[in-house]
Amino acid sequence: MGRCEMTFVDAQIDRIVGPTHHFGGLGVGNVASQNHAGQISNPRAAALQGLDKMRLVAGLGVPQLILPPQPRPDFRLLKALGFSGSPAEMLKSALSEDPVILSAAASCSAMWTANAATVTPSCDTDAGCPVLTVANLSASLHRSIESTHTLKDIASLFRSGFDVRPALPGGAPMRDEGAANHMRLSGSDGKSGLNVFVYGDGPPEPQCHWPRQTKAAGQAIARSHGLQESDVFHFKQHPKAIDAGAFHNDVVAMSHQDLLIHHELAFAPESYQEIERLERRFENVIQKPLRILTISSNELKLDDAIKTYFFNSQIVTASQSGNTKWTILCPVQVQQNPVTHELVNRLCAEQIFHAVHFVDLGQSMDGGGGPACLRLRVPLSEQEFGHLATSALWTESRDSDLRAIIKERYPSELKIADLADIEICQKALEIQEVIAQCLRQDSGSI
């Protein structure tokens, strides 16, 4: 393996929420999504809330990259599923015959970029470059249409010196939801780390919800990325967590460098030996103990963990004035819940984190995504970072331009029936193209 020693940074990639953002209730095993199905959404607020988080992250000295919304509605999907005629006729037919398909075609779920891909940094593989495999998201119709466009976006962002791969084939047996079910544990010195893949299939199965990640998918990615077998770990997600609404691992666990925080019901008992192997291997490779904080059900009920998305907080290493500080970005729901508020205060008092910020992501949260859902974390060396396209990097001027577009052109209310209005949909596609053009300017390298 590449036991390199160089400075790495965790670039954060977020996607702007699209103008057809709505509450379709499509998320498999996603309690928040299902509970808000049919409610009126606010696409303008959703996009601005996402930009507010990006601004905060960039202000902490963390590299923040921006992707445009994927084009929606997806008329190719409607046509492939048997709807014909003009675009206006296709929309009306879909609404009357199968509104779930219409909702899927207009879904903005690609905003949750933690599901965009699984990332291996160059120091973990002999490939000599970062390797990214786009997630197939084959567990859901509305998400399965994302991978083709995601591949184009990521390939455009990571130009030279990166290995960007298409989604795994294989359908249901190879269900893959990307980085939301992957944790990388490491030191802070740029040396190779250990990779944990979390899956939900296999006995005992959940009783209520279909697991969206398979063990076979994680194994395939580990092989494909050239990861050393001794440095790869597969944890089975606890069926109770999946049934409670933890449709991804990042709803009940979070990690950063040498820290793993998880709910006691995050992992199934059959994973305990694998966790012990991880601890031994980490100390052997990284030359320091792995810090594992297990949050008990007595301290935090599983239902409260999922309602607040405490474990979906975003951990970053802030870099300001030459100093680095571990900072955690929590949903405001964590602050509003006395138990989780006390928990994060305790973690700060114990110097696990040096600072906490509470972020309002109400529109994303109602769809089932917190701060960590909205970002794809990509560890990059300084040289690799320099190869990224300048047009994707957050800047004050780019932020200002995007806010102006969103405030002027995004709707402030949207319901599913509106998605059958051809004027609304044409305007949405025009807005998405304007944003894409904004993020294609100043092309080059950073």
Spans of model-derived segments:
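The feature marks the mature, well-folded catalytic cores of soluble enzymes
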Residues: 2-446
